[in-house]
């Protein structure tokens, strides 16, 4: 009986210790992803391309250029309204081959719980946005 209890305690302790790095990683990712993501969404509301693209890498800036920005914003906000500031809920992330995919649920004026993925990559020592998808 005592042996079974000791094994149970050890098992629980191992599981708790194994989750610590996961939660620590979550905090590190959210520390750069949350402000960058909020900035992108608020800049869309404001029609401010300079703010919208400030964390984009060069490829992302060329693919979603200042000329294309108004049409992009219209395609999103035209369907769901403006983003509701600070409504994003960080759901998690996945890192593979130096690319970190963050997942959020966000609210707009006309629709709640819209899925958003923001993709980051470290470039020249800074985490840059290399992808952005609304689902």
Regions found by a protein language model. Give the residues of each.
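Absolute protein N-terminus
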Residues: 1, 25-29, 135
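Short, low-complexity N-terminal intrinsically disordered segments enriched in polar/charged residues
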Residues: 19, 24-46
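A general boundary/transition motif marking the beginning of the first structured unit of a protein
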Residues: 28, 40-41, 60, 64, ...
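Residue-level signal for cytosolic alpha-helical hairpin/rod architecture
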Residues: 34-37, 53, 113
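Short solvent-exposed beta->alpha transition segments
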Residues: 50-101, 109
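Exposed beta-sheet edge and beta->alpha loop/turn motif
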Residues: 87-135
């Amino acid at each position: 009986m005592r042996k079974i209890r000791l094994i149970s305690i050890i098992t629980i302790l191992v599981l708790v210790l194994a989750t610590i790095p996961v939660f620590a990683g979550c905090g590190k990712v959210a520390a750069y992803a949350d402000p960058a993501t909020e900035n992108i969404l608020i800049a869309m509301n404001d029609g401010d391309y300079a703010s919208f693209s400030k964390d984009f890498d060069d490829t992302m800036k060329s693919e979603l250029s200042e000329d294309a920005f108004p049409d992009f914003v219209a395609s999103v906000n035209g369907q769901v309204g403006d983003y509701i500031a600070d409504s994003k809920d960080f759901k998690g992330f996945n890192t593979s081959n130096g690319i970190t995919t963050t997942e959020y649920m966000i609210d707009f004026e006309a629709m709640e719980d819209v899925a958003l993925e923001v993709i980051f990559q470290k470039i020249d020592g800074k985490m840059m946005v290399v992808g952005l998808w609304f689902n």
